[in-house]
């Protein structure tokens, strides 16, 4: 399913449906296809919002959970969302947790799916290997409950990002 990405100032996001606001924060490998089933289900009863976290736009110093939480906080203030059902997946769950601990006045409920920060599967006994496609594929697969979620297109995208950001 393809969704229109809206822009309001510096913020890019998807917004579908009407009703109570459900904001979904994506993970590190945040392909919108990961949320398409949830968007399709809830857009009939909720305003579903998926802000595009600036994972590769922020400078390295601010590409942190704290930096992403600040970005998210400014986003919901800018859009004036209140009584939000906040759902975070993976890194997005970690950002949601930090946000709830700092600024809970706009959040009605919190839903976590595979949130980082609860249990971390480290990189293992090796250093990250740029240029090694097979290594990147395996690490990308480890990110998901179902390794088949790491499609060739997603692995290609991660491989490109890892090798460009030096």
Positions of PLM-derived features:
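Active-site glycine-rich loops that stabilize anionic/oxyanionic intermediates
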Residues: 19, 27-30, 90
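Flexible "cap/lid" loop of the alpha/beta hydrolase fold
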Residues: 94-102, 107-138
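Alpha/beta-hydrolase fold catalytic core
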Residues: 1-22, 44-46, 60, 145
């Amino acid at each position: 399913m393809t969704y229109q990405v809206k822009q309001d100032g510096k913020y890019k996001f998807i917004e579908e449906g009407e009703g109570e606001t459900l904001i979904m924060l994506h993970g590190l490998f945040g392909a919108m296809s990961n949320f398409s089933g949830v968007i399709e289900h809830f857009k009939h009863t909720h305003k579903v919002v998926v802000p595009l976290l600036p994972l590769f736009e922020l400078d390295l110093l601010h590409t942190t959970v704290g930096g992403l939480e600040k970005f998210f906080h400014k986003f919901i203030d800018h859009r004036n969302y209140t009584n939000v059902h906040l759902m975070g997946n993976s890194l997005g769950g970690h950002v949601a947790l930090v946000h709830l601990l700092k600024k809970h006045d706009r959040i009605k409920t919190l839903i976590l799916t595979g949130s980082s920060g609860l249990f971390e599967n480290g990189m293992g006994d090796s250093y990250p290997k740029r240029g090694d496609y097979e290594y990147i594929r395996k690490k990308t697969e480890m990110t998901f409950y179902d390794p088949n979620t790491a499609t060739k297109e997603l692995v290609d995208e991660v491989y490109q990002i890892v090798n460009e950001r030096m």
